[in-house]
Amino acid sequence: HFEYIVIDEFHHAVAKSYRNIISYFKPKFLLGLTATPERLDNKDVFELCDYNVVYELRLKDAINKGYLVPFYYYGIYDDTDYSVIPEVNGKYKEEELEKALMIHKRAEIVIKNYLKFSNKKTLAFCASRNHAEFMAEYFNKNGIKCCAVYSGEQGKNAMDRNEAIRGLKNGEIDVIFTVDIFNEGVDVPEIDMVMFLRPTESPIVFLQQLGRGLRKAKQKNYLTVL
């Protein structure tokens, strides 16, 4: 058995599958790492470590200390009325949400605001695979190099995640449209713009997605958020 176990994305450790592993190995020392310890289901992550928090650093402090880059957040108005979109288990019904978001008028607002900035390494979060495909198609038709990255059945504009990241880094791609596949386990410091093109019910998911662009990189002084 292992005496020392380190678990990244430790907020998942309250799940039964993680608990079974921890119980099986019974480590003498367990170290959990997470940027989002709070959970929407109110399960207590800290309990697993007997409330022994070795080090805590909040987002604002990490930026102030220079560990992460600051960000400029630009709110963009569109007339999408989310109050009329039905919800299922606290989330918007995907088909109805797509109808509201996948319209050319809204895509034109997005591209118009995107072009105001000189950022060339952008990650854009969409509501679904269809939405990501729609946005990638619209941007490609307007001469902006982009692709869509998501799990499941692949569409016309879809690309493998690693291939898309390589393309973004070397300048072959300007924008990656995705859903949730970039929330965790991805380290691309070069990202200098994040676009939220979807409503996000979870503050945890929002912070995870925002965090994709906060890593420091050469010639990167800040992150632009739309």
Task: Show the residue positions of the predicted features.
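Catalytic P-loop NTPase motifs of RecA-like helicase/translocase cores
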Residues: 7-14, 39-40, 185, 203, ...
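Inter-Walker segment of RecA-like/P-loop motor cores
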Residues: 1
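Conserved interdomain linker/interface between the two RecA-like ATPase lobes of SF2 helicase motors
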Residues: 53-123
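SF2 helicase motor core recognition
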Residues: 66, 176-194, 211-215
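Conserved helicase ATPase core of P-loop NTP-dependent helicases/translocases
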Residues: 132-136, 140, 144-182
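Post-DEXD/H (motif II) to motif III coupling segment of the RecA-like Helicase ATP-binding lobe
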Residues: 4, 11-73
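Conserved segment of the helicase C-terminal RecA-like domain
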Residues: 203-208, 212-226
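Conserved RecA-like ASCE P-loop NTPase motor core of nucleic-acid helicases/translocases
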Residues: 121-128, 149
